[in-house]
């Protein structure tokens, strides 16, 4: 694997007697490999809640992370869930887009129900509550 083609680095970490497999994303979204993948999102900021540190940011969509996929910021990969209009605790769906931040180390995945699609404009309208603070590009 090289940095230009991207890929996933698989690691095994040992926690006590337990072995945990962790995938670390390395420039993978640059080549669009994740778009179309089915993922499970654990929702830690349900629709209708506020950001834990920035109380003026209201979550108009469900937002969470994909377990065991580590993003470049060292945290699990963040994801917006579109098309679900009620708060949920977790969600299994398809990655339909990647939001690339030019002024941050993070990329956000956009996940939706199988067979549902959104235009770049529709995605930005739904995630602008948070993405308005960054220089971003949506990749479909």
Task: Identify the meaning behind each predicted range.
Residues 22-140:
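Hydrophobic N-terminal alpha-helices or hydrophobic patches in metabolic proteins across all domains
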Residues 1-4:
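Short, low-complexity, charge-dense intrinsically disordered segments
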Residues 8-10, 67:
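Intrinsic-disorder/low-complexity coil detector
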């Amino acid at each position: 694997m090289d940095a230009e083609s991207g890929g996933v680095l698989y690691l095994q970490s040992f926690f006590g007697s337990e072995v945990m497999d962790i995938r670390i994303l390395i420039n993978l979204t640059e080549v669009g490999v994740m778009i179309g993948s089915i993922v499970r999102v654990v929702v830690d900021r349900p629709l209708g809640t506020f950001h834990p540190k920035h109380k003026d940011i209201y979550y108009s969509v469900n937002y969470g992370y994909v377990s065991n996929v580590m993003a470049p910021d060292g945290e699990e990969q963040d994801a917006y869930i579109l098309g679900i209009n009620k708060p949920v605790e977790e969600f299994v769906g398809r990655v339909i887009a990647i939001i690339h931040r030019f002024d941050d180390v993070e990329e956000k995945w956009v996940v939706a129900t199988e067979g549902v699609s959104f235009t770049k404009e529709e995605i930005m309208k739904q995630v602008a509550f948070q993405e308005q603070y960054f220089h971003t590009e949506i990749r479909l």
